[in-house]
Swiss-Prot record:
GO biological process: DNA replication; DNA synthesis involved in DNA repair; double-strand break repair; SOS response
NCBIfam families (alphabetical): recf (TIGR00611)
Binding site residues for ATP: G30, A31, N32, G33, S34, G35, K36, T37
Naturally occurring in which organism (per UniProt): Sodalis glossinidius
Pfam hit, one: SMC_N
Function recorded in the entry: The RecF protein is involved in DNA metabolism; it is required for DNA replication and normal SOS inducibility. RecF binds preferentially to single-stranded, linear DNA. It also seems to bind ATP.
SUPFAM superfamilies: P-loop containing nucleoside triphosphate hydrolases
Protein name from the UniProt record: DNA replication and repair protein RecF
Molecular-function annotations in GO: ATP binding; single-stranded DNA binding
PANTHER family per the UniProt record, alphabetical: DNA REPLICATION AND REPAIR PROTEIN RECF
Family statement: Belongs to the RecF family.
This protein's UniProt keywords: ATP-binding, Cytoplasm, DNA damage, DNA repair, DNA replication, DNA-binding, Nucleotide-binding, SOS response
Length: 364
């Protein structure tokens, strides 16, 4: 699976771009502020319905323009398979239109299914040293792409938790919450089981990849479901009713789950250097993408912003070799071509980005 064509209109500082893309490596080279990260963000938005640098739609629409428009052509990688066209537009009011093969009315989740991707940015350390929500997102990405019923269950869980938290401000007895909990409890257990199963299944891939990237450390991974593992979730909700009512939110549940990572028994953020943390982040993203390939034959896109950040020459070369081994489509941004010369025998296309203008510089 690869994007063979990308069209961008009025996104960030890019007025218009129509790019024919390589199935392997695509390099975006330009000075800071030139727009190379905007290209990566356009691809990410096409597959997620939102940007990775801003949650506000208006901030990614080019100045004084009413909307942004993104289009892509997805090649399945099979000679006999038909290509799929996808599109996303959004105006300043936040109204979106998702198009697949020319028809409207589709959902962003359908784009995400068609375009699985892994993002590596200088801000991506939050996966390791940020709050649990970032690691829940890591697990949920895997569950979304491996469990057909996950997205519906996850959406219903969010809705029920929101309703339950609102009800906690109004009720005086637990019995008044049962209408929500009767639906919430089986959903919570199902989602927790999916996350636990996914965490256990991907552990071998993560361990093997981390052994290549950080052989000097013994790394341990553990899934925490968000409530005491010895407790029945339904009984816990009833037992913690007064506490939840005082807090006005549900204090325990799958929305509090975490995926903890330790090095030599210590939280990784307390022992690893910035360069080592980036390698670990890359290892996790690569392992997750490769697990998807092993499980169902689908390949991720890898988006890597500021390739050289935090990495010395040896580590850049190691990352490049592992990316090549995935046989996936990769997009890499760099300030100069010198920063990507560590990718051995690189094949693909190099684009020059300057003040929002994108031009093909070379093709190997």
């Amino acid at each position: 699976m690869a994007l063979s064509r990308l069209m961008i209109r009025d996104f960030r500082n890019i007025s218009v771009a129509d790019l024919s893309l390589a199935a392997d490596f695509n390099f975006l080279v330009g000075a800071n502020g030139s727009g190379k990260t905007s290209v990566l963000e356009a691809i990410y938005t096409l597959g997620h319905g939102r940007a990775f640098r801003s949650l506000q739609s208006g901030r990614v629409i080019r100045h004084e323009q009413p909307e942004f428009v993104l289009h892509g052509r997805i090649e399945a990688g099979n000679v006999d398979a038909r290509a799929t066209s996808v599109g996303l537009s959004r105006n300043r009011l936040g109204d979106s239109t998702v198009r697949i093969d020319g028809s409207d009315g589709h959902k962003v989740a359908e784009l995400a299914q068609l375009l699985p991707m892994q993002l590596i940015t200088p801000e991506g350390f939050t996966l390791l040293n940020g709050g649990p929500k970032y690691r829940r997102a890591f697990m949920d990405w895997g569950c979304f792409h491996n469990e057909p019923g996950f997205f519906t269950a996850w959406s219903n869980l969010r809705r029920l938790l929101k309703q339950r938290n609102a009800a906690l401000r109004q009720v005086s007895r637990y019995q008044q919450l049962r209408v929500w909990d009767q639906e919430l409890i089986p959903l919570a257990n199902r989602i927790s089981e999916w996350r636990a199963d996914y965490s256990a299944a991907i552990a071998a891939d993560i361990t093997a990849t981390c052994a290549q990237f950080l052989p000097e450390f013994r790394l341990d991974f553990s899934f925490q479901r968000g409530w005491d593992k010895e407790s029945d979730f339904g009984e816990l909700l009833e037992r913690q009713f007064e506490r939840d009512r005082a807090l006005t939110y549900t204090a325990s549940g799958p929305h509090k789950a975490d995926f903890r990572i330790r090095a030599e028994g210590v939280p990784v953020e307390d022992i690893l250097s910035r360069g080592q943390l980036k390698l670990l982040m890359c290892a996790l993203r690569l392992a997750q993408g490769e697990f998807l390939t092993h499980r169902n034959g689908r390949r991720c896109l890898y988006l890597i912003d500021d390739f050289a950040s935090e990495l010395d020459t040896g580590r850049r070369r190691l990352l490049a070799e592992r990316l090549k081994a995935t046989h996936a489509q990769v997009f890499v941004s760099a300030v100069s071509a010198d920063q990507i010369r560590d990718i051995p025998d690189e094949k693909g296309k190099m684009f020059k980005v300057e003040q929002g203008k994108i031009s093909l510089q070379s093709e190997v």
